[in-house]
Amino acid sequence: MKRVTFVAADLSTGGGVNKVIRDLAVLFKQTLGADVTVVNARSDRPSTYRFPSDVPVPQHRRQSLLSYFRLLLRLRKASPDFVTSSWTQDNILVVLAFLFSRTKTIVVEHSSWHFHSWAIRLLRRIVYPLASSVVVLNRRDLDHYRAYLSDVRLIPDPVTVPSLPPEQREKLIIAVGHLSPLKNFEDAIRAMAMSGLEKDGWSLAIIGSGRSEPDLRGLVEELGLTRTRLHPSQVDLASWYARASLLLVTSRLESFSLVLAEAMLSGVVPIAYASDGPSFILEDFPEHLVKLGDVDALARRLVRFASGPDAEPLRRALRASIQSRFAPDIVVEQWRELLEAPCR
């Protein structure tokens, strides 16, 4: 039985990456028969996403960088067969901590290659070749890392949503994520205003929390929108997916976009800025991609899909695309191939 250690920074913060860590840990345990431990390395608060009882999740208090590295060295002494991490800075430290050990290091890059500062990119350029494998989530990142890595693989996130009884689709547009400048919800609000869809009974719900909330609320008021509202973050988005007709993804950077894939699986029609992740997920649906920052085009696309003909054939095609590429049983087999590959 292979022993796999997942290193997570802070499982209490929610978000797509932590959900993927939980889902992969469960898949490794239940499908691959691995002995899995998930280390909550920099938080002693409970995980947002529940883990089964047979997957231990040891907690560690938030600590200095030096103490964190010492923790990684202690994990090294346990000699797992594989260790995997998911954030760039953590990836760098994990590779260094396990260097020259018998443990195979697999780092998953959840940030687009051009996201970080030059200093972090330089460290990554030096350290990532020392990892056993690097996993990326879209084709553009794959092309970038192939230039200097001998073992880089495209393995997307597994995508699932709870099954709910079908509901009548509402005149509802949703946008989901942390309320930060990077997620760029200002463009979603401006596109809603430019589209004029509120006068036809359409609503925009922005679901999330973060420091941009006051500015976003101010923009809604400034533009005179009465059917556009902000809602608190929610762990389970299934009920929103079941009701919504359209999804807006306006992030400046996305290496994958779990929300986009989950919404498509639920039959929500997406409109997304063409950053790396959405471009990969929607590669068979280019008409749903909009040039970054083009709010006029975003508004026009909203009107087009809000007023289009029966969307059920499109919804079925969107679901089928996600099921055929990102279903857990497909993704876990790609991981099985990686775990069973000869060690470097």
Stretches found by the model and what they are:
Residues S233, R252:
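Aromatic "clamp/platform" in nucleotide-sugar-dependent glycosyltransferases that forms part
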Residues S163, P309-E340:
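A charged, aromatic-enriched C-terminal amphipathic alpha-helix characteristic of glycosyltransferases
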Residues G15-D23, K171, H178-M194, L204, ...:
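A conserved mid-protein helix/loop that constitutes part of the nucleotide-sugar donor-binding site
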Residues A274, D284-D296, V303-P309:
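Conserved acidic donor-binding segment of nucleotide-sugar-dependent glycosyltransferases
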Residues S85-N91, E109:
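Short His-centered aromatic/hydrophobic patch
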Residues V7-L66, H144:
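N-terminal strand-loop element at the rim of the active site
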Residues R140, P158:
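Carbohydrate-associated surface elements
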Residues V269-A272:
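Short hydrophobic beta-strand element within catalytic cores of glycosyltransferases
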